[in-house]
């Protein structure tokens, strides 16, 4: 049986970061500030983990708020949510929701 996890991973596109005048750390620091307030641990660069499998609210907040920022969707390359034994591509899910709600 696989170990259940609650984790979110962010990978930014270096070329898009340069074009927008941002750095990876600037982007991650915005996420880190929120994550640390909500008991999420950065287990490696850009990977945030919750030791409490019931602590999904911070992840839902990130999913709802980051795409609405002026910068996030322009520079994100990979955005993955590992919830228990499932893996969700948050970029694909976001664009699917946008298409459905258009």
Please provide the spans of the model-predicted regions.
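Short, mixed-charge low-complexity intrinsically disordered segments
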Residues: 61-97
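Short, intrinsically disordered low-complexity segments
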Residues: 36-75
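Residues in well-ordered beta-strands of folded domains
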Residues: 9, 49, 80-82
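Long, contiguous binding/interaction regions
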Residues: 2-28, 32-34, 66
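Extended, alpha-helix-rich binding/interface surfaces that flank or overlap catalytic cores
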Residues: 101-102
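Intrinsic-disorder-associated interaction segments
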Residues: 24, 52-55, 80
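A general marker of short, structured functional hotspots
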Residues: 6-8, 30, 44, 55, ...
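Generic structural motif
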Residues: 13-15, 53, 84-86
